[in-house]
UniProtKB/Swiss-Prot annotation:
Catalytic activity: [GlcNAc-(1->4)-Mur2Ac(oyl-L-Ala-gamma-D-Glu-L-Lys-D-Ala-D-Ala)](n)-di-trans,octa-cis-undecaprenyl diphosphate + beta-D-GlcNAc-(1->4)-Mur2Ac(oyl-L-Ala-gamma-D-Glu-L-Lys-D-Ala-D-Ala)-di-trans,octa-cis-undecaprenyl diphosphate = [GlcNAc-(1->4)-Mur2Ac(oyl-L-Ala-gamma-D-Glu-L-Lys-D-Ala-D-Ala)](n+1)-di-trans,octa-cis-undecaprenyl diphosphate + di-trans,octa-cis-undecaprenyl diphosphate + H(+)
Gene name as annotated: mtgA
Subcellular location field: Cell inner membrane
Protein name: Biosynthetic peptidoglycan transglycosylase
Keyword list, A-Z: Cell inner membrane, Cell membrane, Cell shape, Cell wall biogenesis/degradation, Glycosyltransferase, Membrane, Peptidoglycan synthesis, Transferase, Transmembrane, Transmembrane helix
Classification via NCBIfam families: mono_pep_trsgly
GO CC term, one of those recorded: peptidoglycan-based cell wall
The species this protein was found in: Chromobacterium violaceum (strain ATCC 12472 / DSM 30191 / JCM 1249 / CCUG 213 / NBRC 12614 / NCIMB 9131 / NCTC 9757 / MK)
Single GO MF annotation: pentosyltransferase activity
Length: 228
């Protein structure tokens, strides 16, 4: 019986190592090649095609230099103020989120950095399990080790969800404001950043209570952001 358990454990460890080598290989490749669809994008496309087999995602890759500095500043101001300084994990932000959730008695805040969000979007499903959190942490370390901050941010800006089937800065800019990502104004960029925590909801409720207030707060913080 113990030999059977050992073989099962060995097989699981081998599968874990092989999967993470596969992930690492992709990340190394992405140093100078752009990713195609992320795991999360594929998951959302499958969801949309359950209702409409012809459904397609709105997505177009654009280089880092073709994205407005306003949007770059707005997202860091909203999602990860210490992005250029930390190594993938903002421990102060995690502690603050934990204390806020503890005080409210439910999860109302997250401490995920841009690198952690990217790890989830690129490789993981939307489910929440201890295994997924462990894998997210490992992938985050790989991203931060292999890629520089600018490349991490460029990929993030191009794969982040911004609405029902809307992914990336260029698609979001054209979907909401009928302009390219390079031409976004400060207020437009701040509004897009404000939508990120719940993009499909804000896609359907663009005048939702609190969205305008959050947009103004982000816009005020943008001047203090350091870009990679």
């Amino acid at each position: 019986m113990s030999r059977i358990l050992f073989k099962i454990l060995a097989a699981l460890v081998a599968a874990f190592l092989l999967y993470n080598l596969w992930v690492l290989g992709h990340i190394i490749y992405w140093r100078d090649h752009n990713p195609g669809a992320s795991s999360f994008m594929n998951e959302q496309l499958a969801r949309l095609q359950q209702d409409d087999p012809e459904a397609e995602l709105r997505h177009k890759w654009v280089p880092y230099d073709k994205i407005s500095p306003n949007l770059k500043r707005a997202l860091i101001a909203s999602e990860d103020a210490r992005f250029v300084d930390h190594e993938g994990f903002d421990w102060d932000g995690i502690e603050a989120a934990f204390e806020k959730n503890l005080k409210k008695g439910k999860i109302v805040a997250g401490g995920s950095t841009i690198s952690q969000q990217l790890a989830k979007n690129l490789f993981l499903s939307s489910g929440k399990t201890p295994w997924r959190k462990l894998e997210e942490a490992l992938i985050t370390v790989m991203l931060e080790t292999v890629l520089d901050k600018r490349r991490i941010y460029e990929i993030y800006l191009n794969v982040i969800e911004w609405g029902n089937g809307v992914f990336g800065a260029e698609a979001a800019s054209r979907y909401y404001f009928r302009t390219g990502a390079s031409r976004l104004s400060s207020s437009q960029a701040a509004k897009l950043a404000a939508m990120v925590p719940n993009p499909r909801y804000y896609d359907e409720h663009r005048n939702a209570p609190g969205l305008a207030r959050k947009t103004r707060i982000i816009q005020r913080r943008m001047a203090y952001v350091e870009l990679p």
